Amino acid sequence: MLIDTDVIIWYMRGNEKARDYLDSNPRFRISVITYMELVQGMRNKQELSALRRALRNWKAEIIYINEEISSKAMFYVEQHYLSHSVHLADALIAATAVSYGLPLLTGNEKHYKIIKDVDVQKFEPK
């Protein structure tokens, strides 16, 4: 399972459903894009340390961008940006899921609905 940025944000904010899911399904994967988005949202070094600790405890694997992911993401942006405003980060995360054959757990289904290749698993924080 590839975990989208929003699910980890919910976890860091103390959301019970996110906590239950991530704590009971360790060894998931995240895109390096997700990691960078999370780091950009940190307000201080303590939050960054908490994120790193959580990822270590979960034994989460960070998937780095390669040529296949880049190529798929470029295709998604070319095909869907003008009509549906597919953003670069979402295209890269979707391409990572597709390239690795992983379902994508996200609460932001609307970000990925136009990309038919992605197996989106809906996360409901409430």
Question: Language-model features: where?
Answer:
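Short, well-structured N-terminal submotif of metal-dependent ribonuclease cores
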Residues: M1-I30, Q40-R53, K126
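Generic structural signal for small/hydrophobic residues in well-ordered secondary structure
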Residues: D4-T5, L38, A73, A97, ...
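Alpha-helix capping/helix-boundary segments
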Residues: V7-I8, T34, I69, L92-I93, ...
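Nucleotide phosphate-binding site architecture
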Residues: I8-I9, M36-V39, K113, Q121
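Short, structured coil segments at secondary-structure junctions
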Residues: S24, W58, I115-K116
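A general structural signal for well-ordered alpha-helical segments in protein cores
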Residues: S31, Y35, L48-L51, S70, ...
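Active-site neighborhoods of divalent-metal-dependent phosphate/nucleic-acid chemistry enzymes
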Residues: E61-G107
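Acidic, PIN/NYN-like endoribonuclease modules and their adjacent C-terminal/linker elements
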Residues: S99-K126
